[in-house]
């Protein structure tokens, strides 16, 4: 039986031009082209950081995993929002005769909002899939962050006052209503690293970053808002974007430009450990993740639904409008509506608020 590993990531523009960024942004918005001023802002951000190394780094990560596991698995690489696209790579895998595939998403934490965006593409009459849900607890990855933060504390902070700011990509606040495990995983991940470093609860905090402006509330505090709200600052901040493993725009701009600029304004020293990128400790974590999971059941993939079935709707949410295609809703919500029918999907309060904002609630 021919087996494969499919390593997947978010993607990035294929070329740093206005139209190249526009194409990528349109893919993120599910085929709806953003307004020109939105595209211009994102394009300017890419120019500010000199482009993005994400695709180069990811291909190097894939090659390093293949060097370790290539005798047992064919290793493939795909993006969610840029070439090579996941459906195209699955087509190539089918042509290569692959029958079983371990899906390794290059995001250590599991989120309905983001990870299910990968899962929806896993369709094949030939291939059975095994999706690794999360791998943030891998000891090698934890040790990477501990070692790199400790190095900054020892060599640069020394005896000065300091606070470690763990940040993670934010998610819409209605993820709380769905019981999304992502938020708790981020807190647990930060605590595990902090405990290994011997940090007290006053020496570190959790923030969120990189939220999208799609007209709905996101998990707070945003890292920039957190910095602005502090009445006193330490001598040093160490920013740890713990939900990412590779350098890309949400680290190189959101942290290294925006957070850095605020630190300059407040007279605080800015630090960020290098991202794992191609470090051997990250590769160890990825390889071990495959080893730990490879004997689990492979199956035709279907998105999980049981999380939603446990929700009890209030009277207010029972008559929400059936049509949702034009709303910026997570794909897993749309897919659930399509599969089970609008009348059978139990939506929590904040989903209702999304419909209200869009003026889509039916009249009483």
UniProtKB/Swiss-Prot annotation:
Primary localization: cytoplasm
Annotated binding of Fe(2+), by residue: 169, 250
GO annotations of cellular component type: cytoplasm
UniProt pathway annotation: Porphyrin-containing compound metabolism; protoheme biosynthesis
Family: Belongs to the ferrochelatase family.
Protein name: Coproporphyrin III ferrochelatase
Catalytic activity of the protein: Fe-coproporphyrin III + 2 H(+) = coproporphyrin III + Fe(2+)
GO molecular function: ferrochelatase activity; metal ion binding
InterPro entries: Ferrochelatase (IPR001015), Ferrochelatase_AS (IPR019772), Ferrochelatase_C (IPR033644), Ferrochelatase_N (IPR033659)
Uppermost EC category: lyase
UniProt-annotated location(s): Cytoplasm
EC number, as in UniProt: 4.99.1.9
PANTHER family in the record: FERROCHELATASE, FERROCHELATASE, MITOCHONDRIAL
Keywords, sorted A to Z: Cytoplasm, Heme biosynthesis, Iron, Lyase, Metal-binding, Porphyrin biosynthesis
Record GO biological process: heme biosynthetic process
Regions annotated as coiled coil: none
Domain of life the protein comes from: Bacteria
Function: Involved in coproporphyrin-dependent heme b biosynthesis. Catalyzes the insertion of ferrous iron into coproporphyrin III to form Fe-coproporphyrin III.
Residues annotated as binding Fe-coproporphyrin III: 29, 118
Organism: Streptococcus pneumoniae (strain Hungary19A-6)
